[in-house]
């Protein structure tokens, strides 16, 4: 099988490519250039596309004895991932750019280009497993290493893309085992640190990145009774559940901490309140992607709402709005704090991914949009 190995310049993708070679595939390495920003190209940059990353990817390919290319996908990346990140924050939502990158770049632009060139699949260093179910249909499962599992950010792929993907690290027990294997193979990236920053925010300052693109937009901070208790430089910079950075001039009358409970970008207003207002049980997700049969009746499952969050017991089903659009509805067994629109909600049956959607509404707003939720118990 002809396999295109995505080489980021890190240890995971290098070992994944090595394992693809070991499996007997005809492997070609490719490094994706995703930015034309000088700050991200500089040596030592923590974002994507640094000179060091490209050089490390090339050295890994040399050690493995595979051809290596750099593909410029910066236009696609900017027009989809970065643009979505900015527009979502501008709309008062909290996006996950890694999900969008997997959806639009790694398993879309990269995969499509590879297929057009005669490749059969793309191999990446993601921690997840693909198993074959009934009639050979691919299933996405959690990785053996629960601490590194990335099925949450891969659930957006869809079954057709999943069938063209390889995750050679899915069964590896620990990241230490990956590093040891890299060292044994003579890969220079064996001790290279992991990257946890948003890749296109080179200095790690997300708020500064947003300000530089969206500008200063002064507005009021209100309490839940509508009283002005502070000011901000842009509602887009806040997310539900946030406490840090509010800079309120005086404490609440009851002395309790205040958190962001709503972001109203139409009026450029941030609303703050006590922690208990953050607890919700109902979630409505839009644009669902299913990797299993859609549940048209209430079904027991677990859901995950953050990249490294816990698996939360819930009941899920699909619902249809007045316009005929399908949604994923979920009722959590226990209330959850700080869930914001724009985040991804992923449903699981054990280790298997059932489906994914983008959070559109929570709590009573979710019930108002999906009345079916009202029949599953009390609403938080």
UniProtKB/Swiss-Prot annotation:
Q: Where is the active site?
A: 101, 199
Gene3D superfamilies linked: Adenine nucleotide alpha hydrolases-like domains, HUPs, Translation factors
**Location within or outside the cell:** Cytoplasm
Main subcellular location: cytoplasm
Matching InterPro entries, A to Z? MnmA-like, MnmA-like_C, MnmA-like_central, MnmA-like_central_sf, Rossmann-like_a/b/a_fold
Chain's role: Catalyzes the 2-thiolation of uridine at the wobble position (U34) of tRNA, leading to the formation of s(2)U34.
Q: What is this protein called?
A: tRNA-specific 2-thiouridylase MnmA
Recorded name of the encoding gene:
mnmA
